[in-house]
Curated annotation (Swiss-Prot):
Subunit architecture: Homodimer.
Organism, scientific name: Cupriavidus pinatubonensis (strain JMP 134 / LMG 1197)
Homology family: Belongs to the GrpE family.
Protein name: Protein GrpE
Entry-linked InterPro entries: GrpE (IPR000740), GrpE_coiled_coil (IPR013805), GrpE_head (IPR009012)
Amino acid sequence: MEEQKQTPSTPTPDTAAEAAVNAATAAPETAGADDVAAQLAALEAKAREHYDMYVRAVAEGENIRRRAQEDVSKAHKFAIENFADNLLPVMDSLQAALADGSGDIAKLREGVELTARQLSAAFERGKIVELNPVGEKFDPHRHQAISMVPSEQESNTVVTVLQRGYTIADRVLRPALVTVSAPK
């Protein structure tokens, strides 16, 4: 006996394009198959289009995330730039004072006062506020007590400030070093 190759009665297309070609060349009795093949090809094209849109959306999301991280990194890196720019005139004044060899104490004092005003203005622009709590109640969040001294003031009141403190945007940058009145 001779083996006969059996061929399937309907072709099995490898791709949607082959299916469309096969459907177009099929006999009229397979007109329903033509419609199905055309629908299949259209749906496969639509699926490829949606997959492409999905891949692009994922890539765009990654790009947005990366750009946001870069923006945050730059913000951290250059956050002090504006404040440093405000300090440059103070440095210029100090360098001018050091370069002055006249020895005139009154002129030097005037220059130091001007420089202190420049520094205060730079602090103000940077929202740095000086803490000078003489006469206030002791606040451990804003003051650091160095010692207790006998005083006529109420107990736990700041008597003297040894070193001024500073806040920046209502956050303590450095607490004020103070002496506090002792209980009577």
